[in-house]
Amino acid sequence: MRNDVHLGHKARKRFGQNFLNDPYIIDGIVSSINPLPGQNLVEIGPGLGAITEPVGKLVDKFTVIELDRDLAERLRNHPDLAEKLTIYEGDAMKFDFEQLVKPNNKLRIFGNLPYNISTPLMFHLFEFHKDVQDMHFMLQKEVVNRLAAGPGTKAYGRLTVMAQYYCKVTPVLEVPPTAFVPPPKVDSAVVRLQPYEVLPYPAKDLKWLDRVCREGFNQRRKTVRNCYKSLIDKEVLEELGVNPGMRPENLTLEQFVDMANWLHDSHNADK
């Protein structure tokens, strides 16, 4: 039997398709999402319905976004789900999630994300953080490790800082390749991202936060003083409580934001 065909559908590499088919894992994911009737639920990439079907048994209606035309058509004709689903056929990377927001009913987003686009897709979703209650995603385990990492670890990087800027990050469940058809070449994991009601360390301008993160993690083995010498003087770093001799990979989220806010203020003062 071919290992890239599941329920009569051939997995498409260009869409990064791997279909979940382990009942124990599926049950664990649905339990962690804990979908309830009346909630504003949105699934990205429902695929063949491994998560969609059990969620559909618990709620009256929800929204799905599916890029694969054949899979979207299957859902439109699904005997149990068709009446419950609002189906958007298209690319979640270009989707305006604001259109799904309802008064006093924030979005609860979940999905088995295609690993080839998971990082840029999360950056896209962070733009809507004020409208999102939580997100549960199946991702490459390495990406979940990066999301949850702490300063000074190998996994700590720009994705870590930006994810933790917006969200509380909680790893939920590890998933082996055997839980999928076809099995991916990597281990997977489920993560919960809960956007903060109030950002703990708000940046005055995200462009500066992105800049200090990029500069720092592109030169993570340099000292902070050398890494940022064209942007911030050693004396200013010390005033901000940043040790100029440390490496950027040891900076905390708060320190990255402090540097970004100082750059914002100093550049605006020059105008």
Swiss-Prot record:
Entries under Pfam families matching the protein: RrnaAD
PANTHER family reported for this sequence: DIMETHYLADENOSINE TRANSFERASE, DIMETHYLADENOSINE TRANSFERASE-RELATED
Organism whose genome encodes this protein: Vibrio atlanticus (strain LGP32) (Vibrio splendidus (strain Mel32))
Catalyses which reaction(s): adenosine(1518)/adenosine(1519) in 16S rRNA + 4 S-adenosyl-L-methionine = N(6)-dimethyladenosine(1518)/N(6)-dimethyladenosine(1519) in 16S rRNA + 4 S-adenosyl-L-homocysteine + 4 H(+)
Alphabetically ordered keywords of this record: Cytoplasm, Methyltransferase, RNA-binding, rRNA processing, S-adenosyl-L-methionine, Transferase
GO molecular function: 16S rRNA (adenine(1518)-N(6)/adenine(1519)-N(6))-dimethyltransferase activity; RNA binding
NCBIfam families, sorted: ksgA (TIGR00755)
Name recorded for this polypeptide: Ribosomal RNA small subunit methyltransferase A
Name of encoding gene: rsmA
